């Protein structure tokens, strides 16, 4: 067994194809050699029946991962055109002179722009048949035709240049010209379907029908599981937790580390529904309304112009969203992204987005799991939850959606081109949703209120007024700091009797919201309501492919491949022993008290633990909390 780097495999393929292109062989021979080079790459990863048979199949990557690594290789040829492209475009220009100007302009464009223009032209030509049918019902040149043509112009804006001329005095000539456009355009559409734009190798770096069917079946299984394993989110608790993050001063976040960015980055994704890469690096946002922003820079759009703008909702005030996003992106932990996107060298074949996602997913997802109190949850769940909240909040009341159904709403609000993709974003349901819900500002000091209810019981607590004075001191401390932990050492500083202090802390424990931890020290009892409501039956984690393309999710740049032949199973070799998963503590987000101390809560082995004390950073506080109970 040896490690073969994906980057090396891809670079080998690229070098081989470039050498073939530069050779003086006949084009037919070049095509055969390019096809063979693509086959060698596919065999090294997945298709070699000698390598991947018997027990060797256990070492083979999944079909979905194979497709993702194929996508990486294809992206290396994205800027290269097919060897016959120029010749075929010239032929089409001569054959369809009414479209010659558009077609000829492609010859001077970058490959990405050619794809965009070709896609736009195909969309325009697909409108010919329905437009021609509607136009046949219009008596061009009659008195009532102007209004009908105006409606057609509004419905088919790409054809306005020709439709508007039908209202002129020479409408007969313009009508005949339009029909010629229709005639040539219909034939051109058929030929554009056959036009090869991409480099020849891309037509061989494709999945076989069986492999594609396998992936499609997996997607269907995932969708079926999602629709039968919905996750219920307590709306008020979830949104209150998000607002608590957004309303905290940025100074309380440790924005000098990757993991320290997680709370604010997740909260901004939660209120905008944008992907991690769009929040942290690629997206551009401008306030367009109190709860709307203009968004450009959608990820996973191969042929879309990055300047395309969408109007999306924000679940907090748009101005606050943009301000916090600017603050997050300007922090020290995000200052090296321009270097990160360059990768670690020529063998780093991940996309720029994939390189950033790789470092951020590892830093953010552990915090997300602790935020939800659910190991099944990951950062990108914020996108589906946002879509559900936005639907409940805006779909029925915003006139923008009055003529469309919910599938179109989900598709547009998430920026999808395919209406089927949004089906994967409906796993989450909301409990206790209300459009009139507003976040609590947290002004009420509940601990102080509970202590005040004990006032009448204090005069007889100790001799004289000692009990009353002790009680008043505690109330003052809690009034100054509602989250203060009151301990024996806290009250000894005020010269009260240690015996009376111990009695008082036990007596007022419920009012103070404190308990004695396993270390014998007083700890704050912080009861955070569950965000994910429990299911009646346990729901297993759904191992799913990504919603569109997995390439950006794959941060591994090497896999292990067996250099020799596939191993046949032998009687001596038994199945691998299953290793039990090691228990890991699940921490809730560290709470910075603002005085150099932190509050830490975590779950371990089915038990809840709490700790409070001084620490230099949230991570140090978590380490101290762990070592307090498990040194």
From Swiss-Prot:
So where does DNA get bound? Answer: 275, 300, 383, 416
Question: What's a BP term from Gene Ontology annotated to this protein?
Answer: viral DNA genome replication
Q: Where is this region: Disordered?
A: 533-592
Has UniProt tagged this entry with the keyword DNA-binding?
A: yes
**What is the E.C. number?**
3.1.22.-
Q: Which cysteines are joined by disulfide bonds?
A: none
The broad enzyme category this protein falls into is hydrolase
Q: Which family does it belong to?
A: Belongs to the Caudoviricetes Protelomerase family.
Which Pfam families has this protein been placed in?
ResT-TelK_cat, TelK_muzzle, TelK_N, TelK_stirrup
**GO molecular-function terms, A-Z:** DNA binding; endonuclease activity
Active site, renumbered? 425
Q: How does activity depend on pH?
A: Optimum pH is 7.
What this protein is called in its record is Protelomerase
Magnesium listed as a keyword: no
The record's note on quaternary structure and interaction partners says:
Monomer. Homodimer; in presence of DNA.
